[in-house]
Regions:
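Charged, surface-exposed helical/loop "interaction arms" that form contiguous linear patches used
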Residues: 358, 362, 375, 428-429, ...
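ATPase nucleotide-binding head domains, primarily ABC-like/P-loop NTPase cores
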Residues: 29-32, 227, 297-298, 303, ...
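Extended, charged coiled-coil "arm/hinge" scaffolds of SMC/Rad50-like chromosome-maintenance ATPases
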Residues: 496-534
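Conserved phosphate-binding elements of NTP-dependent enzyme cores
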Residues: 3, 7, 14, 533, ...
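Charged catalytic and DNA/RNA-contacting regions of genome-maintenance
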Residues: 1-328, 337, 341-344, 348-357, ...
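C-terminal tails and terminal domains of large nucleic-acid-associated
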Residues: 827-863
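Active-site phosphate-binding and catalytic loops of NTP-dependent enzymes
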Residues: 104-113, 248, 387-390, 449-461, ...
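Amphipathic heptad-repeat alpha-helical coiled-coil/stalk segments that mediate oligomerization
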Residues: 201-209, 213-216, 265, 280, ...
């Protein structure tokens, strides 16, 4: 047995092997050592023919899924090796084989999945000058591919990976080598790369894998026919999925090709800082934009919403296509309420279809799908007559499954609690033979009693009885006084003191049927259920198309419900050269999660005289909230949602960049300032005039003058070179002098009010610059001891007298006349040495040596 185990283990070296032995899955050697720690199992040993016993631990087979889930959550792969036959007499070993491999990206059990989130597995192919990545959720069948061929294609690949958030990533050798140095992977923002055979990424092998998967002779319909990188990425992934799942991937029947020019780019920092799908506090949904907007009624709608939020559109036509649908639902309470009620009747059609296609569907799954199918006609009725294109398209893509649904409901019991193991899920009355066998099983006593009565009447033997024993089954017992009346067709089996025992052919036939009824019932129910699953499998594409349409409707309805509740407006999508013009804008999440009335603010940013907003004001006044709310309004508008404002004109944004806050990255030996500058560099290098930038406190991680100089230069570069719409919050009030000097820079401040030495935050933004930071007042609000804040006030007065920043501009010149920072004369080598020397600590000899060194330096400078 151990030899067979070792052979199987060698074929699955990167997995923890669950090896079925009777009622347990056993693990041995290193697998046992690892699993015992991760699963908190008792470690024992087993004789294996070696000098030492093999480490061993095990779990009951019926509890396997919960243990598999724990191992997968810990990043492990699990190979399940099952007994493929029942134990037979004379055969020492039963045949065993690996029936599936469970990895983080291939989990299919409902209990181990978040129903509101896709469980993607991604595959990356990295070439010399371009690359591609694809991602798939095998529970829904969604497969998407994206080609990356810009000069910064590697960064683009990582941006997409962060956005998709796969549970598992595989890739070719070139990508694995690159990923080994990626901070995103080392820091845990992305999972570690799983090894997979390089041959699967060879273009010919990958192409053949895809042709076989989709049963086609060309990949032209999928728009990747001559795209080697996309073919390699997809082919490698499909090969991996087939190898782990051990069955055909029926529901993976299409490839969606995503293009860079179709959607806004959101990098790791933007996704995190804007809290689009997770909050920054604990990484949960609460407090994120997804949490706010997710009022969907179906699990598949919730998953689609998450994808929309992280992939805003950059096509005006497609955005308005969605907005028109939201507007119709927003405007009609009857339509919105009716669809909302009907959607509540829809189960997770996507994942139900996935379980049917991979053979894991239960009778309850099929019945749930039939309930969803029967709810669809009512949705189509509600959409009938709509003149809005997206609503018409949704209606057209919702198919009619009434006949299939009625067949399922006539065949399968509606109450799963009545099911026993492998039986009783087919309704009475659906199959005559099944009904007869159930009657035989459930009323065997009545059947035997009826035969007994018939035999008494035929033979005239009043004492005739039918009984049963384990030796020869049912028999007829006749007392000695009636032996002469026994018919010729009775076959004597046993003589007793008081009479004889007989059998008949009819009785034996009935016995066989009674004793085999359970097995026959099980066989017939399986046959009927297999036919139903086969019928559904034939219609998988129709089910998927319908599920996609219902998901889209669910998201649009969710947008409308949120917009109605919080009084949002329909944004007007304008050309990229138009201004970002929001009247009465609010932060959607802060507004929804606060009991206080949110103070609205306007925003006007264009490509001309007002493209950089310099925002000043004290901490806690609302600068960051204001900047984030405008970025979120961009995102909401471009996913097709109404926005929190009285009115909004939104130009198409290609990327949103954020530079908000920073922490020391000790793992990578990066200080707060280094992290900050890296983020700023990314913005300066990659932002375009179509981008939307929010930068908070640039330069704060270093000395005052260094920080101010950097912040000043960054503003200049953004205004004059990048020309992107920019919100720039700062405590460097000197930057307000740039208005009127650098074209496009405008000053704004968050208003506060001083009352009796205390500050009141008014949260209102207006033109101008703040003349005071109120840092000491904020410190007092935070609970800093009064003795410290009083001392701080005294020091501040002294510093203000010296005016340490007056040298930032040449004396006798107004800011408008000369805004260049005054360059300090560089120090000579001699001056550097003198300034760095502690003269008081020099010995006479050391002083003499220093003078000689300085003399040599001076002579060198004058040669």
């Amino acid at each position: 047995m151990m030899a067979t185990y070792i052979d199987t283990k060698l074929q699955n070296e990167d997995c923890i092997l669950f090896y079925r032995l009777g009622d347990f899955y056993e693990m041995f050697f290193d697998d046992a050592l690892k699993a015992s720690k991760l699963l908190d199992l008792t470690l024992t040993g087993k004789d294996c023919g070696l000098e030492n016993r093999a480490p061993m631990c095990g779990i009951p087979y019926h509890a396997a899924e919960q243990y598999i889930a724990k191992l997968v959550a810990a990043g492990e792969k699990v190979a399940v090796c099952e007994q493929l036959e029942a134990p037979q007499k004379g055969k020492k070993l039963v045949d065993r084989g690996v029936i599936r491999i469970v990895t983080p990206g291939t989990v299919t059990e409902d209990g181990n999945l978040d129903k509101t989130q896709n469980n993607f597995i991604a595959s990356v192919y990295l070439g010399k000058t371009s690359g591609a990545l694809c991602w798939c959720d095998i529970t829904t069948g969604q497969l998407t591919v994206r080609k990356c061929n810009d000069k910064d294609f590697i960064s683009e690949i990582y941006d997409v990976l962060v956005r998709v958030a796969p549970a598992e990533i595989i890739g070719n050798g070139a990508f694995r080598a690159n990923a080994s140095e990626s901070p995103l992977i080392e820091h845990g923002a992305l999972p570690k790369i799983s090894d997979y055979k390089e041959s699967a990424y060879a273009v010919k092998n990958a192409e053949n894998t895809l042709l076989e998967q989709f049963s086609v002779s060309t990949l032209k319909p999928f728009e990747i026919e001559n795209d080697e990188e996309s073919i390699c990425a997809c082919g490698g992934l499909i090969a991996y999925l087939k190898e782990t799942q051990k069955h055909a991937l029926v529901n993976v029947n299409n490839v969606i090709k995503e293009k860079k020019e179709q959607c806004m780019t959101l990098d790791y920092n933007s996704l995190k800082n804007l809290e689009l799908v997770r909050n920054m506090r604990d990484g949960k949904r609460y407090g994120s934009l997804l949490w706010l907007l997710d009022k969907t009624d179906t699990a598949m709608g919730s998953r689609l919403l998450s994808q929309w939020i992280t992939t805003p559109l950059i096509s005006e036509e497609k955005i308005n296509y969605r907005l028109d649908g939201v507007n119709e639902l927003y405007s009609s309470a009857i339509l919105r309420g009716g669809i909302d009620e009907r959607l509540k009747e829809i189960h997770d059609m996507e994942r139900l279809a996935g379980r049917i296609s991979n053979g894991n569907a239960t009778p309850a799954d099929c019945y749930s799908l039939s309930e969803s199918m029967l709810a669809l006609p009512n949705i189509k009725i509600l959409l009938f007559g709509s003149t809005v294109k997206i609503m018409q398209d949704i209606s057209d893509n919702i198919d009619d499954f009434t006949d299939i649904a009625k067949l399922i409901q006539s065949a399968i019991n509606s109450d799963p609690t009545t099911y026993s193991k492998d039986r009783n899920y087919i309704r009475d009355g659906f199959d005559k033979e099944l009904d007869r066998l159930r009657q035989m099983r459930n009323h065997s006593g009545d059947i035997i009693k009826r035969i007994e009565t018939q035999e008494k009447e035929k033979t005239g033997i009043r004492t005739l009885k039918i009984a049963y024993n384990k030796v020869f089954g049912y028999y007829i017992e006749v007392s000695n006084s009636f032996k002469d009346k026994v018919p010729y067709n009775y076959i004597r089996k046993q003589t007793t003191v008081n009479g004889e025992r007989y059998i008949t052919e009819e009785l034996k036939n009935v016995e066989v049927e009674i004793l085999s009824a359970d097995e026959s019932i099980k066989r017939i129910e399986i046959e009927i259920f297999s036919k139903i699953k086969g019928l559904l499998a034939e219609n998988i594409k129709r089910v998927q198309r319908t599920a996609n349409a219902v998901s889209c409707l669910d998201v649009l309805c969710s947008f409308a419900k949120v917009a109605k509740k919080y009084n949002y407006c329909k944004p007007q999508i304008v050309g990229e050269n138009n201004a970002f013009n929001v009247v009465g804008g609010r932060h959607p999440v802060v507004e929804a999660s606060s009991y206080e009335t949110f103070v609205s603010n306007d925003a006007y940013i264009n490509n001309g005289d007002s493209r950089v907003m310099i925002i000043t004001g004290p901490n806690m006044a609302g600068k960051s909230t204001y900047m984030r709310q405008n970025a979120l309004i961009c995102v909401m508008a471009q996913i097709g949602s109404f926005v929190p404002a009285k009115s909004a004109e939104i130009p198409i944004v290609d990327r949103i960049f954020t530079r908000i806050g920073a922490n020391d990255n000790i793992i990578y030996n990066q200080s707060t300032f280094m992290v900050e500058m890296t983020e700023v560099a990314t913005i300066l290098l990659h932002a375009t005039k179509r981008s939307f930038l929010i930068l908070d406190e640039v330069g704060r991680g270093t000395s005052t003058f260094d920080g101010l100089g950097i912040a000043w230069a960054v503003v200049e570069y953004l205004a004059e070179n990048v020309r992107a719409k920019t919100l720039f919050a700062t405590h460097y009030h000197e930057l307000s002098e740039l208005e009127g000097v650098i074209e496009g820079v405008k000053n704004y401040k968050i208003t506060v009010k001083e009352l009796n030495g205390k500050i009141v935050f008014l949260r209102k933004i207006m033109r101008g610059s703040a003349n005071k930071s109120f840092g000491i007042e904020v410190a007092a609000l935070a609970g800093v001891p009064k003795v410290v804040t009083d001392r701080a006030k005294a020091i501040l007065k002294r510093l203000e007298k010296n005016d340490l920043t007056r040298t930032m501009l040449p004396q006798n010149e107004k800011p408008a006349d000369n805004v260049e920072l005054k360059e300090e004369k560089p120090l000579s080598d001699v001056e550097e040495i003198l300034l760095s020397t502690d003269i008081n600590s020099l010995t006479p000899i050391a002083a003499f040596k220093l003078v000689m060194e300085l003399k040599e330096k001076v002579e060198e400078e004058h040669e």
